[in-house]
Amino acid sequence: EQTSIDTLDYLELLADRAIIIHEALNGYDELFGIDLVLNAIEGVDKKYVPDFVLHIGGEVVSKRLKSFLQRAETVWRISPNGEIADTYKNITNVIYGDTVDTLKMIAVGYKMRNLKTPFSIQTYYDLWYDALEKADQHIINYEPAYSQAAAVKAFEEQYYYSDYAPHIHYANSTSIRLANLFARHYVWC
């Protein structure tokens, strides 16, 4: 399901207190290239592993992202219909409620408390931000040889800089993985 504008607004309110990890497939147009980050940090340092995951939205396509988030101690999922989908095989809680309403309560709660971000959280945030920024720059500067990757990158760059806004559908696993690297919009699978 495409991420709503309201959901994005509340994610922005939480962005100074949480690391928002996502696949490009959901249309959250910020940093991208999560698989590149995970490839670079996986097995290198456990300090990247979150102690808490709040999952919103649909399924996660990236096997690497699923595997990484399985290591979190606590995993909660917001489920508007009450469905329990244990993407990470270690779910600890399901919040039965509307995604936007739940994010609003969390974001407003943080803002009302007006708490300073603890040093440990700020350090974790900085660690992730640097890693995501490096991956973002790598993807922008990456020039693949003539291949499927080159075709998808060229297509996505044309789309990104155009005024035209079609709904783009990727239909097989290879194209979806490539879209997850290069797309900065919602991708229909």
Predicted segments, located by residue:
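A general structural motif
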Residues: 3, 27-30, 146, 171-175
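Phosphate- and divalent-cation-binding pockets in alpha/beta enzyme and binding domains
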Residues: 3-6, 63-64, 105, 154, ...
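Residue-level marker of positions within ordered structural domains that often coincide
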Residues: 58-59, 111, 160, 184
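Acidic-glycine-rich active-site phosphate/pyrophosphate-binding loop
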Residues: 170-189
